[in-house]
Structure formats: C-alpha cells, structure tokens
C-alpha cells in the first residue's frame, strides 16, 4: 500500500463508517506525521549531499533522498525501498506502543530481491548489506524458514542471506528459525554455527508444528 495507500484506505472506510470519524482522524494524523518525518530526512540527505566532497558518500546520500521520496506516498518497488519503508514503520511503531513484532523476513523481502535481480538492479552482496542495515535499525522479531499453509518449505537462498546479513552485523538480532521436521539440515547446521560463532543470542529456534497447532487452537484455519 505505502503511506499514500494507507491514507486512501482510511478515506474509503471513513465514508463507510462516518460514526468513527474521530478514529480515522487519529489514524490520518499518525500517517501524516510519519510522512513529515520522512520529508525531513529527504531534506537533510539532500543538504548533506550538497556539501559532501567524497563522490561515493555523496551518491549514497542522493540515493537515500530518492529512495525516501519514492516511498513518501508510493508503495516500495525495490528491495532497498522495502527495507527503508520497514525501517520507518519500525521506528514509528516502537514510538507508538513499543511494538516489536516483525514478519516472515525471508518471504517478504525475497519478492523484491527476485524482481531486482531480474532487472539487474542489485547484487547479492548489496542485498545482504541492506539486510544488515535493516537488522541494525531495530531488533524487531523476524522469522525465517518454516512451512507455508500447504506444508511446503519456505526456505530459500534468501533465508541463507538473512543469516549472512546478521553475521556481518555481528550484534544483537531478533531472528527466529522456524524448525519443521523436514528442515534442510544444512541450513539448520549453518544457523547453529552462527549461534556459537557470534555468541549474540541469535538465531532463536521455534518448533514449527507446535507453533502452527497453537494458531489453530486460537481459531486460525489449517
């Protein structure tokens, strides 16, 4: 959706539920606040780029400004934009209610990575760097691996890249490997290796079958 899409969705449901106008007013204030926050970052990146003498650093500042301009209203279209969008959401949600729950990191970001690779917009090393930057931004809880609703494995090359990004960061992360009975033992061993190598308490491990049964007990369909 992007921030602009969220505003459109709020406007749509405001018309359907005018009795909840106060609620929608509050939601719109939050989104506009985040957009204002992003706008300041764009302005500061451009200001720093004007005085930066190192060409690589100047180019990165200009890219930061453009990435944030792209997601100010629109939905993310590249992996870098997706990571940047999540960074803003993480910071805003922490401020709002100390939220720490993330998502299935490998599955969500993989679609952007695959599209970028197809178009030649990114390299594997750049993607790992973006993952490390995202993990540095905030220790939100993320899952990797496990199975989908049909019991098929979600593990992919990108799952390995998440571990590599966390390894390069070499700091506290909140990554959990979903362990199912058919998990690729090579991946599981690699995850355990990182746990002992870095001694930073990651990754954690969660039994996928018990997790899924718990969700079903709460009313989620099989």
Q: Predicted regions: what is each one?
A:
Residues 1-27, 56, 60-63, 67-74, ...:
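Conserved catalytic cores of very large enzyme subunits
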Residues 45-50, 112-116:
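Hydrophobic side-chain positions on well-ordered alpha-helices
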Residues 35, 42, 46-49, 58, ...:
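Heptad-repeat amphipathic alpha-helical coiled-coil interaction surface used
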Residues 28-36:
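Extended non-globular scaffold/tether segments
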């Amino acid at each position: 959706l992007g921030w602009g899409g969220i505003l459109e969705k709020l406007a749509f449901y405001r018309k359907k539920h005018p009795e909840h106008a106060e609620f929608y007013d509050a939601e719109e204030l939050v989104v506009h606040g985040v957009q204002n926050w992003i706008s300041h970052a764009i302005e500061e990146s451009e200001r720093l780029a004007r005085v930066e003498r190192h060409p690589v650093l100047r180019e990165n500042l200009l890219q930061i400004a453009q990435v944030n301009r792209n997601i100010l209203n629109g939905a993310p279209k590249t992996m870098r934009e997706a990571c940047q969008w999540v960074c803003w959401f993480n910071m805003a949600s922490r401020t709002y209610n100390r939220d720490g729950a993330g998502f299935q990191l490998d599955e969500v970001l993989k679609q952007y990575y695959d599209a970028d690779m197809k178009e030649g917009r990114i390299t594997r090393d750049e993607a790992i760097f973006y993952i490390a930057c995202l993990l540095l931004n905030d220790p939100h809880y993320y899952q990797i691996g496990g199975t989908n609703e049909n019991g098929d494995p979600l593990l992919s090359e990108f799952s390995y890249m998440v571990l590599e990004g966390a390894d390069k960061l070499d700091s506290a992360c909140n990554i959990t490997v979903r362990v199912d009975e058919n998990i690729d033992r090579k991946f599981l061993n690699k995850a355990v290796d990182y746990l002992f190598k870095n001694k930073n308490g990651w990754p954690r491990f969660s039994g996928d079958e018990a997790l899924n049964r718990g969700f079903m007990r709460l009313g989620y369909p099989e």
